[in-house]
Amino acid sequence: MNTSITARELFDQQRDKLALRWVAGPKGEHREIQAGSNNARRPSLAGYLNVIYPNKVQILGTEELAWLDSLDARQRWETIEKIIQVQPLALAISKNQSCPEDLRAAADESNTPLWISSKRGHELLNHLSYHLARTLAPRVTLHGVFMEIYSIGVLITGEAGSGKSELALELLSRGHRLVADDAPEFTQIAPDVLDGTCPELLQDLLEVRGLGVLNVRDMFGDTAVKKNKYLRLIVHLTRPMTEPTPSGYERLTGDSGSRHVLDLDVPLITLPVMPGRNLAVLTEAATRLHILRTKGIDPAAMFIARHSNLLERRTP
């Protein structure tokens, strides 16, 4: 999924938090940053003023403005030209410092957004870098019900009619929490982290066949919903055409594997859906088993090791 953010969107999203004022270049509000650039050297999203390797958002603190003031007239004009020519998303001046008139005029003439903030430079840098990195991170929408089970994020998947929503409803009644139904969005915010959230349209809602759309927050309370959660496990529901006959090894380890999501391989456990099976209990057990495995505890491996040791002791 391609993502981008414009200068206007960034300003509106951070205006209150960073006490931003737009002082020049209002016509540049449609400038944008695109995610997934294939440039040999991608510019930093935000950083202190750098003329050689310009950032997409150039921050001018006390030292940067003092450096501009130290230049003679020609050097200052050439430097401002270089700052403007690369078409940054915006220029941001920290600590409510006065904006140099020549910089303001250049920003207006080139339609370069120029902001002033009451925050210190490092606060601007931290907030803008984090917000831009998260907004422009790779993201994907998956079909399923995303829940928090025993404090970890579990995505329940399966074909239509496999019982995902009914399972989610049973898990909610057992004290677990809903993040998103039907179309959770996952963002890779770190090399090994997928953060799952719910689209605004579907917030707090769960669709169950025969009952229609339910408001989970109203039915189960505020604690039954969760704003976001890191994806750690996928539980896939499948309806076998015949009674499954797992091999001996599968009976020991279960039907485990992984699913590739963005750049990560997420652990996956497959549960056959058959009459009489308590899927809520099985899903809870699968989650507990995954937690144990992440701690290095594998009951199947322990059993195989015990069995091997027993055979070795009995071998003459």
UniProtKB/Swiss-Prot annotation:
ATP binds at G158, E159, A160, G161, S162, G163, K164, S165. GO terms for molecular function: ATP binding; magnesium ion binding; phosphorelay sensor kinase activity; protein serine/threonine kinase activity; protein serine/threonine/tyrosine kinase activity. The active site is at H143, K164, D182, R251. Mg(2+) binds at S165, E207. It catalyses: [HPr protein]-L-serine + ATP = [HPr protein]-O-phospho-L-serine + ADP + H(+); [HPr protein]-O-phospho-L-serine + phosphate + H(+) = [HPr protein]-L-serine + diphosphate. Its cofactor is Mg(2+). Keywords: ATP-binding, Kinase, Magnesium, Metal-binding, Multifunctional enzyme, Nucleotide-binding, Serine/threonine-protein kinase, Transferase. It is an enzyme of class 2 (transferase). The Walker A ATP-binding motif also binds Pi and PPi. HAMAP family: HPr_kinase. Catalyzes the ATP- as well as the pyrophosphate-dependent phosphorylation of a specific serine residue in HPr, a phosphocarrier protein of the phosphoenolpyruvate-dependent sugar phosphotransferase system (PTS). HprK/P also catalyzes the pyrophosphate-producing, inorganic phosphate-dependent dephosphorylation (phosphorolysis) of seryl-phosphorylated HPr (P-Ser-HPr). This is HPr kinase/phosphorylase. It comes from Xanthomonas euvesicatoria pv. vesicatoria (strain 85-10) (Xanthomonas campestris pv. vesicatoria). The lineage of its organism: Bacteria, Pseudomonadati, Pseudomonadota, Gammaproteobacteria, Lysobacterales. The gene is hprK.
